[in-house]
Amino acid sequence: MGGTFDPIHHGHLVAASEVAAKFGLDEVVFVPTGQPWQKSHKLVSRPEHRYLMTVIATASNPRFTVSRVDVDRPGPTFTIDTLRDLRAERPDADLFFITGADALAQILSWKDVDELWSLAHFVGVTRPGHELHDMGRDDVSLLEVPAMAISSTDCRTRVGAGNPVWYLVPDGVVQYIAKYGLYAAPANAADLTPALSGSDDQARTE
């Protein structure tokens, strides 16, 4: 499951669990982006913060793991590079790439799209009330997940306004955000990194 995870919230976790159950997945690998292209107009939390919050959030589920392939790779994050790295680590696995359905609609503009189809089955998750458009491909599935009504943007806004995010994000992540003062106003520049400008893919689950 690829995403910025800034912060990871219960919507991400429920979506991962629902997809795992529907498709009989043995493992869900969460892959926090390194330097996301499509957040070019925003500052995002440093990759290490987002990685550690994801580790904390997934620790209690033995089916969930977290990969550093995007965090450790220098330069911008492209889904094709993520999938190539995961394929190299798991050459015999059937890979499913979980992302937001709105992001999936842009897949034809992604880097090396023809190779993407050969590397993984794509699953787009969305919130209730969001219209799902069938892409007409056997290697693309769409799944409605009620908890996806939660968004990372709303969580950041709530923290910045001094409002609680308990029960929107896992307890350990709430404590991590408070410990490092993430999303508080004014933000600590040392905890932020600019996303790279560009027009390519990396529109994943927020």
From Swiss-Prot:
Known EC number: 2.7.7.18
Alphabetized GO MF terms: ATP binding; nicotinate-nucleotide adenylyltransferase activity
This protein's name: Probable nicotinate-nucleotide adenylyltransferase
Family matches, as HAMAP family: NaMN_adenylyltr
Record keyword NAD present: yes
UniProt pathway: Cofactor biosynthesis; NAD(+) biosynthesis; deamido-NAD(+) from nicotinate D-ribonucleotide: step 1/1
Catalyzed chemical reaction(s): nicotinate beta-D-ribonucleotide + ATP + H(+) = deamido-NAD(+) + diphosphate
Record InterPro entries: Cyt_trans-like (IPR004821), NadD/NMNAT (IPR005248), Rossmann-like_a/b/a_fold (IPR014729)
Job description of the protein: Catalyzes the reversible adenylation of nicotinate mononucleotide (NaMN) to nicotinic acid adenine dinucleotide (NaAD).
Assigned protein family: Belongs to the NadD family.
Gene Ontology BP terms: NAD biosynthetic process
Organism: Paenarthrobacter aurescens (strain TC1)
Key words, A-Z: ATP-binding, NAD, Nucleotide-binding, Nucleotidyltransferase, Pyridine nucleotide biosynthesis, Transferase
One Pfam family per UniProt: CTP_transf_like
Residues spanning the signal sequence: none
